[in-house]
């Protein structure tokens, strides 16, 4: 199939979706292409921290300043994606108070509101904290739902005329002189081939940025840093809990809906495709985070996962955390003489909008168009909607729930299917809270597949899809199998290998 | 209170041990936290589904046992396994019986559209074996979200339909609710009439396994009368109504014969001295009660049952703290693929040939304790498809040996 667009945005993470929305609000025709579903990369695999900037305020004040500005904007345009929890930076006896004092001063310099709490004050806000803590500093951290955020951006872009192609991978970039002339792509599910003609291309592929540039014979130095996280079965604290010391392994616990996410590690990777959470990382995360919240030692985990931070390499060796978390915008016209190609990489989820704005500004300059950004003013679709859990609880017993862990109603799934263009199981799981609870989809995916048969939407062999899902689920569960998760697993194996002989 | 035999664990192996004891004229106490995995997973009696030869299972199994003396079956032996199965069957006289077809494994349809090999099949499921040859209609119920007739129809290449039920008090229906309703004549009248309307030229009707807890054959007969077509049951997601039938039958018969049932209790302490168990305690706050017996059977199941406990370091038995074979460190417990055979499933309590607990060196640990059921080491019931067979055989044999 032959497609034409003014701008082709490559990558369906927060950055790509943000750019797609920004451009369409400016009236520039754009098309997004993504080889998986939206959020298949780092955007869907992070700890969901809604940064205040506190985490970088000492090491990278520039990134911190960006964070706090964007933090304020997102509270206005995407309140439905954010839980305003606040965050505490906790000092333990072994940390001393030097870093804390530098931290408070840096917050002041970056105009980041920070309030020093005494031990008793901190413990009364968060009784689960280590009672030996020295003090805590309160900052406006929060929790963000990247799925809601990215899908809302894509939805709004669509309203303003943009399009997107999911599960389609670029196979070749044809360079002719100083331009990328055509793009060849392939639908990974059905094999259809696309020939795309775009006046401009934006490479927003995150960890895959260099891989894409290789197709045009270009290269940038990227460091791929794996960060691993663990999800608990319950929410441990109301607020985000950070360790008040230079960023290190296992120093953050972020509440997320009904669970908490423990993070993170930092391990250099060579390959963006094959990575897993190692037993060493699991032990390290539990050991370190339980110093802040002792109950973590005994808590039940439901899943481990890892994401890749795409870091633009500065050249020095050492801890990847030292590489700036600020973003990098590359005009390949200046750098490589390719006039119609831009790469945007690095950055944080919370600065996705700013990254999109700067990218679109650069593009407009190149195009000679003079339209300004409005994404900081216009709320995202869904912003008027109240938060979900209370509504879910109200419907309990009155409607059919597909997922008993996360109270996902049958109608919600029907709605997601109606809205659209969902091509595989993962697409459905990304758009609902199915498979995100305690049983990790052990029951609800079986039910979902049964319903797809009823609705005559089942494509292919349902049992093969179920097997594929169970394997995918296994990757997340295997690293945390002890105590009650071993029981849960015995149940799942008893069902699928036992009763059902799958 | 003093007993001849105390059985800890109320799953199928514990129940079989209690049956064996009471039939030998002994005074028995059975203690259980719950009904065990019986009411979750058991529908039919698996003995060794892995063997799919068409010859008699007994012959294949004795050949297999010869090469696997460390397996629980190796300790019991084929003759005693058969004896145990016969003993189990004495609780299931017609009309609801468990039978094999030609003394070999048969393939029965499951609630996910696959077939599974099993040995003794309850009367309500037997006709499912013919699903491939006969035109079949599969019935589901709107609001019963654990069974999807259309999905089965797609897999089995037959027809499926979903019935809407009248005046359901909730939008969601459970297997247990359906099983209760099935026992009401008015409900069957409705189902019979609705199903009859749907039948075209089908010779078989498949229902999820919810045809009543107490009198499934009565329910089936009535449905067949109303529809004019043969009816069978299909195993579904837990809970298992057929498993409840087994549990209820044992409970009723054992209590009649004088077995003491302590349900909802777990052992809080065991007093051990000189390789003997001298007594156990049950804490039911604020009261602690002590019980003692000449012999004990430990039949507490695996992880779900609470018989084995896995912390991040090791796997242990919380009742007697018996030696458990360890599958290495935690990262080695499970393989990379969900569908692999995981080393953790082979762990369990080590025993000698008479099911006494022993340590790694073969040293006897407790001379008046026997171990039965899936908590034993050296088997892999999921791979072997041997869950109920191991439970029945070792429960029977543990009690036999203890009371010999």
Segments (PLM) and residue ranges:
Chain B
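Residues forming the flavin
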Residues: 1-83, 89-404
């Amino acid at each position: 199939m032959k497609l034409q667009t003014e701008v082709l945005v490559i990558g369906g993470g927060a950055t790509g979706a943000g750019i797609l929305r920004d451009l369409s609000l400016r009236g520039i025709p754009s098309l997004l292409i993504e080889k998986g579903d939206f959020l298949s990369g780092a955007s869907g695999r992070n700890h969901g921290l809604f940064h205040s900037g506190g985490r970088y305020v000492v090491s990278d004040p520039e990134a911190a300043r960006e964070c706090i500005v964007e933090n304020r904007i997102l509270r206005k345009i995407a309140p439905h994606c954010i839980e305003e929890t606040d965050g505490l930076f906790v000092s333990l006896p072994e940390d001393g108070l030097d870093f804390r004092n530098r931290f408070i001063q840096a917050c002041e310099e970056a105009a980041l509101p920070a309030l020093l709490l005494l031990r008793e004050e901190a413990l009364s806000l968060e009784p689960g904290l280590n009672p030996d803590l020295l003090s805590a500093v309160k900052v406006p951290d929060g929790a963000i739902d990247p799925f809601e955020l990215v899908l809302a951006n894509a939805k709004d872009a669509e309203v303003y005329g943009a399009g997107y192609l999911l599960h389609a991978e670029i196979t070749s970039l044809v360079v002719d002189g100083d331009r990328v002339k055509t793009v060849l792509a392939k639908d990974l599910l059905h094999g259809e081939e696309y020939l795309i003609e775009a006046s401009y291309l934006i490479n927003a592929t995150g960890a895959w940025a260099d891989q894409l540039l290789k197709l045009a014979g270009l290269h940038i130095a990227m460091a791929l840093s794996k960060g691993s996280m663990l999800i608990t079965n319950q929410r441990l604290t109301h607020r985000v809990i950070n360790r008040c010391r230079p960023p290190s392994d296992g120093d953050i616990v972020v509440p997320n809906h009904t669970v908490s996410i423990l993070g993170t590690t930092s391990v250099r990777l060579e390959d963006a495709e094959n990575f897993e959470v190692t037993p060493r990382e699991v032990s390290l995360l539990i050991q370190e985070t339980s110093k802040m919240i002792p109950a973590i030692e005994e808590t039940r985990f439901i899943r481990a996962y890892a994401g890749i931070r795409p870091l633009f390499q500065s050249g020095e060796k050492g801890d990847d955390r030292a590489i700036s978390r600020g973003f990098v915008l590359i005009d390949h016209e200046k750098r490589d003489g390719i006039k119609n190609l831009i790469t945007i990489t690095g950055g944080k989820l919370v600065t996705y909008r700013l990254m999109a704005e700067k990218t679109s500004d650069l593009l407009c300059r190149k195009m000679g168009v003079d339209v300004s950004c409005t994404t900081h003013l216009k709320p995202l679709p869904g912003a008027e909607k109240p938060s979900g859990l209370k509504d879910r609880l109200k419907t309990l017993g009155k409607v059919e729930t597909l997922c008993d862990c996360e109270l996902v109603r049958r109608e919600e799934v029907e709605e997601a299917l109606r809205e659209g263009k969902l091509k595989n199981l993962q697409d459905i799981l990304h758009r609902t809270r199915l498979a995100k609870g305690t049983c990790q989809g052990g029951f609800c995916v079986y039910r979902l597949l049964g319903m797809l048969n009823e609705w005559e939407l089942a494509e292919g062999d349902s049992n093969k899809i179920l097997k594929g899902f169970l394997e995918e689920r296994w990757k997340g569960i295997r690293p945390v199998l002890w105590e009650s998760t071993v029981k849960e697993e015995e149940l799942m194996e008893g069902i699928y290998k036992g009763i059902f002989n799958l | 209170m003093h007993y001849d035999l105390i059985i800890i664990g109320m799953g199928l192996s514990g129940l079989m041990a209690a049956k064996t004891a009471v039939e030998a004229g002994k005074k028995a106490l059975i203690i259980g936290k719950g009904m065990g995995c019986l009411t979750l997973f058991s529908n039919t009696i698996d003995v060794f589904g892995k063997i799919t030869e068409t010859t008699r299972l007994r012959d294949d199994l004795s050949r297999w046992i010869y090469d696997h003396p460390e397996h629980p079956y190796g300790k019991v032996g084929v003759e005693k396994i058969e004896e145990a199965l016969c003993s189990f069957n004495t609780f299931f006289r017609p009309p609801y019986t468990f039978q094999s077809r030609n003394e070999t494994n048969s393939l029965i349809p499951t609630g996910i559209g696959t077939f599974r090999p099993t040995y003794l099949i309850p009367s309500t499921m037997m006709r499912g074996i013919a699903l491939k040859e006969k035109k079949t209609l599969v019935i589901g119920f709107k609001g019963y979200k654990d069974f999807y007739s259309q999905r089965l129809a797609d897999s089995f290449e037959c027809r499926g339909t979903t019935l809407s039920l009248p005046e359901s008090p909730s939008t969601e229906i459970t297997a247990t609710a359906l099983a209760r309703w099935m026992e009401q004549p008015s409900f069957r009248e409705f189902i019979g009439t609705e199903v009859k309307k749907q039948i075209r030229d089908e010779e078989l009707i498949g229902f999820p396994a919810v045809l009543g807890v107490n009198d499934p054959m009565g329910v089936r007969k009535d449905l067949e009368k109303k529809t004019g077509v043969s009816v069978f049951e299909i195993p579904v997601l837990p809970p298992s109504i057929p498993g409840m039938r087994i549990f209820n039958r044992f409970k009723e018969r054992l209590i009649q014969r004088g077995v003491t049932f302590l349900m909802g209790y777990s052992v809080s302490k065991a007093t051990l001295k000189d390789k003997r168990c001298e007594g156990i305690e049950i804490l039911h706050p604020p009261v602690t009660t002590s019980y003692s017996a000449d012999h004990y059977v430990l039949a507490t199941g695996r992880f779900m049952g609470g018989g084995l406990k896995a912390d991040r370091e090791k796997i242990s038995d919380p009742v007697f703290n018996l030696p458990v074979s360890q599958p290495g460190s935690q990262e080695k417990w499970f393989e990379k693929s969900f569908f692999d055979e995981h080393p953790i499933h082979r762990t369990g309590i080590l025993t000698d040939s008479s099911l006494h607990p022993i340590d790694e060196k073969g040293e006897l640990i407790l001379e008046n304790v026997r171990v039965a059921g899936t908590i034993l080491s050296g088997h892999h019931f999921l791979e072997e498809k041997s869950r109920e067979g191991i439970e029945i055989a070792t429960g029977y044999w543990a009690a036999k040996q203890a009371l010999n």
